[in-house]
Amino acid sequence: MDGKAPAAFVEPGEFNEVMKRLDKIDEKIEFVNSEVAQKIGKKVGRDIGILYGGFIGLLLFLIYTVVSSMFM
């Protein structure tokens, strides 16, 4: 070899068929990746919601204890 890549000649029909199959595979991969990203997003959203809920609950509890101790 003299450092050149080997060349292959393919009929245009075969080439188009292979490209269509590769496009279908690419669409499936993109779909799976988007589903995985959506699932991760839901988990992160749930965790953030739990943290916000805990923080607001703690804040309400502190306000309640301060207000109730003022009137005793």
UniProtKB/Swiss-Prot annotation:
InterPro entries: THM_MeTrfase_su_G
Main location: membrane
GO molecular function, one term: tetrahydromethanopterin S-methyltransferase activity
Pathway named in the protein's UniProt entry: One-carbon metabolism; methanogenesis from CO(2); methyl-coenzyme M from 5,10-methylene-5,6,7,8-tetrahydromethanopterin: step 2/2
The keyword RNA-binding appears for this protein: no
The protein's role, per its UniProt record: Part of a complex that catalyzes the formation of methyl-coenzyme M and tetrahydromethanopterin from coenzyme M and methyl-tetrahydromethanopterin. This is an energy-conserving, sodium-ion translocating step.
Protein name: Tetrahydromethanopterin S-methyltransferase subunit G
Gene: mtrG
